[in-house]
């Protein structure tokens, strides 16, 4: 019920800037950083209990699209609230646009202790759930990321399963079996609900295994050392419409939701002067080594998306630091078209204004705009008004 009322936004979460308030469900409302981590943990627990692949799909939505943007790339600061539509990230008090009073949008290393203690669990918990044992003495790849898992299968034989991929930024995942003896066991692969044309190769040969979206594919056979499984999950564009939010739209590419690329201007601030009033830090901490950053928009953000125009993907090199969740490092950008909405502005509370009505005036000029995966955008417009022409 909460999600139906407040979760009609991209990114897998809901508008609850500490409290979910009646009438405050626009995508400019945010979620706490620790809320992202706890939602991911809840999805992981539900996945373990039920085996339902829905929870893995939802986990990916939060992990790829919401959680990364709540943190500075070096993890040395975070902001309390991150929103699907967020045109400014500063140290102002935005109440009553946000429920409570305080500087909740800046990247501060001292503020919001609940989030500071919690944020570091997000990726470790995620990695713990990549590969799971199954009740029939098999193994299931339920989330996709490069890893090595040591697993007991079949009659108790220990095997090593190596996984290589840059998912969700590429479609292919490669698994290699390491075993000292041939062993029979079922190997399950989760097929995401968005993927309509998945394929599997074993040692280079295409398999006829059933690969239905939102299910697990089961490959049961005798495995030998060096066997290789290649899973391909073709990604397509999909447009979602958010009727309760003025029929705004978001664009997905596989598990990634796309955001307008807003150029980010970082402004360093003293952390002790911009922290929330109840913040605490160790006596003697060198605050100069732990600065706060405000992030201000350095390009127009108030665009309506022309959904009829084609969207084209431009791939970039994989980042050398293995962090794809920044504007400078994200390995894919998308070109689309949009029109500025002049009346859609920063509002009286210093926040990205609520979504304009569908008939709001749009610019006559049709601009090329750049979209990026939402998790790489610390300023973002992810729920767009629609430009009809």
Task: Identify the residue ranges that each predicted region occupies.
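Well-ordered alpha-helical segments within folded domains of soluble proteins
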Residues: 31-47, 118-126, 171
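Beta-strand-rich binding/interaction modules
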Residues: 182-202
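C-terminal beta-rich recognition modules with glycine/proline-rich loops and embedded aromatic residues
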Residues: 57-65, 70-176, 212, 232-389
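C-terminal beta-strand-rich structural cap/linker in extracellular carbohydrate-active enzymes
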Residues: 185-188, 219-234
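Non-cytosolic beta-sheet module surface loops
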Residues: 165, 177-181, 190-193, 221
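Well-ordered alpha-helical scaffold segments within catalytic/enzyme domains
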Residues: 24-27, 38-51, 68, 132, ...
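Solvent-exposed loop and edge beta-strand segments that line ligand/cofactor-binding
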Residues: 4-38, 111-115
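Solvent-exposed beta-strand/loop surfaces of large extracellular or lumenal domains
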Residues: 195-220, 239-244
